[in-house]
Amino acid sequence: VITLRLSSSQRQFLLQATQRYAARIEIATDYLASRQLSVEEASIFHLGVVDEPLPGHEPYKGRLAIPYITPSGVVDIRFRGMNGEDPKYMGLVGAKTTMFNTQACFVADKYICVTEGEFDCIMMTVKTNHPTVGIPGANNWKPHYVKILDDFDVVIVLADGDAAGLEFGKKISRELGSVNIISMPDGEDVNSMMIKQGSEWLDERIRECVTPG
């Protein structure tokens, strides 16, 4: 798995931020509940709330902190608004987007799922047994991700039910060999479908992609 090159001081700062914000995750209890995610489940991914920002993080105050954690440590943090803020997501100044939940690549066997966004990836990981990575937005697919995913027999793209989601799936299928696209209904994403239909809805469709015949 390709990781970002950060200095030791940058890594230490990201770790400090992750720990500080994760300690205040209870502030997001109601927001998480609206997404059918518990505080305990959110803590698996060290999600947090920017209640007391570290220097330089003042623009993210009040947002949900989503750290990108790899075997080598925290490599990035993205910040999601919880009250309809615009933009919905904010990234660190100068940071390059990367793949979310790369640990799944080490535990996956024959197939792996790909979501558009961190939250859908989190939901797949805590609510199902399907190894899943996330790409932070349909426009953030990068060519070197092919090297990461090419080892798997089947790559299952869980595409949002909109034009961007469809293009996201098509883009990955053009670059990888064995890709199955599971499109969500119009206007839906993985999280909303889990809320409406339960994880069984996705389990059934994923099984169809990985079961021969």
Task: Give the ranges of each region predicted by the language model.
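Phosphate-handling DNA/RNA-contact segment within nucleic-acid enzymes
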Residues: 51-153, 168-169
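TOPRIM metal-binding catalytic domain and adjacent DNA-binding surface shared by DnaG-type primases
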Residues: 1-65, 69-71, 106-107, 207-213
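Conserved catalytic core of nucleotide polymerization and phosphodiester-bond processing enzymes
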Residues: 147, 157, 174
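Short, acidic/turn-prone active-site loops that include or flank metal/cofactor-
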Residues: 135-141, 160-163, 184-187
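Metal-dependent DNA phosphodiester-chemistry modules and their immediately adjacent helices/loops
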Residues: 184, 195-213
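Short, aromatic/basic amphipathic alpha-helical patches
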Residues: 167-176
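Hydrophobic anchor at the start of a short beta-strand
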Residues: 131-132, 155, 178-181
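Acidic beta-strand-to-loop metal/phosphate-binding motif
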Residues: 114, 152-164, 183
